Amino acid sequence: MIPVINQEKQGISGDFRLSVAPMMNWTDRYCRVFHRVLAPSARLYTEMVHAKAVIYGDRERLLGFASVEQPVALQLGGSEPALLAKAASIAVDWGYSEINLNCGCPSDRVQAGSFGACLMREPALVADCVAAMAAVVSVPVTVKCRLGVNEDDDYGRFAKFVDWVIGASSSRMIVVHARNAWLQGLSPKENREIPPLRYDWVYRLKRECPELAVVLNGGITSVEAGLDHLLMVDGVMLGRAAYQDPYILHQFYCALSNAPVLPRALLLRALRPYVEAWLEQGVTLRHIVRHLLGLFHGQPGGRVFRQVLTQGGQRSDADWSLVEQALSIIEG
């Protein structure tokens, strides 16, 4: 039995034992609704949005979401406390239930903007950013970080960073990608795979800070592994596994909630009302079905299922019948 800690004490509402990581170019509004169908209580996160984009950009495109997505958090990028505070205030007006600051992205573009993983070298600045946002919003302000940058091998430095962050926020929760970020020499993809995982550091953080809600991210590719982590920390955050093999997300949700595991086809058909509503709004099917391609990962007919959706989804007039065509291959 996986314990549920007192979320109210942590300043977080809802169940955070299971969440889906913010992933650039992946966790858009269509992906998040699909994930909500698969896991009704998982915490969902947007793609990272820079604070300036929230303030000056197309807010409907950047911030719009369906009410069914709740609880959903907006992940912000930036390093200027005043701008982050303004963006957080706007986001809360749009209905987001959590604001999360990105302190883990190692891409060159993000580094050039002085935010993301490079902020781990500036814990006082991160604390200022968190405090500025927490002062103007009523929802939790959290941080997603790495263990350190480059060759950092000092647990004490990591723990000090967490102390700074938590001390600045009314929300005692942190999400940790359990590996370092290399700021030179590795692509973002390689940064998710090559730096070694150090789950022991995250476990230690939880042991030393029992009142802190610790959510672990990184390298979780099975329900069994996730459940094992939940014996040591308060939550797990699935990343690529939830996108590339999304049925894992449903299986994990069912394991935590003692709900029956539903067939893949039934879950996909539950998405139909949302898909048809989006199509009526002028969204083309290809923007939606790209998130569905992994649902039959490893299953007979899965490759042809993906081909039908990928090729047919390019048509401007493609509609739900294409999904049914792809399902007919699976169902024989």
From Swiss-Prot:
Catalytically driven reaction(s): 5,6-dihydrouridine(20) in tRNA + NADP(+) = uridine(20) in tRNA + NADPH + H(+); 5,6-dihydrouridine(20) in tRNA + NAD(+) = uridine(20) in tRNA + NADH + H(+); 5,6-dihydrouridine(20a) in tRNA + NADP(+) = uridine(20a) in tRNA + NADPH + H(+); 5,6-dihydrouridine(20a) in tRNA + NAD(+) = uridine(20a) in tRNA + NADH + H(+)
Entry cofactors: FMN
Database matches in InterPro entries: Aldolase_TIM (IPR013785), DUS-like_FMN-bd (IPR035587), DUS_fam (IPR001269), DusA (IPR004653), tRNA_hU_synthase_CS (IPR018517)
Annotated EC: 1.3.1.-, 1.3.1.91
Sites where the protein binds FMN: P22, M23, M24, Q75, K144, H177, N217, G218, G219, G239, R240
Keywords: Flavoprotein, FMN, NADP, Oxidoreductase, RNA-binding, tRNA processing, tRNA-binding
EC class of the enzyme, as a word: oxidoreductase
GO MF terms held by the record: flavin adenine dinucleotide binding; FMN binding; tRNA binding; tRNA-dihydrouridine20 synthase activity; tRNA-dihydrouridine20a synthase activity
Superkingdom classification of source: Bacteria
Site entry (Interacts with tRNA), positions: N102, K189, R192, R303, R306
Catalytic residues identified in the record: C105 (proton donor)
Family, as annotated: Belongs to the Dus family. DusA subfamily.
Role, per record: Catalyzes the synthesis of 5,6-dihydrouridine (D), a modified base found in the D-loop of most tRNAs, via the reduction of the C5-C6 double bond in target uridines. Specifically modifies U20 and U20a in tRNAs.
Family annotation (HAMAP family): DusA_subfam
Name used for this protein in its record: tRNA-dihydrouridine(20/20a) synthase
Organism in which the protein naturally occurs: Xylella fastidiosa (strain Temecula1 / ATCC 700964)
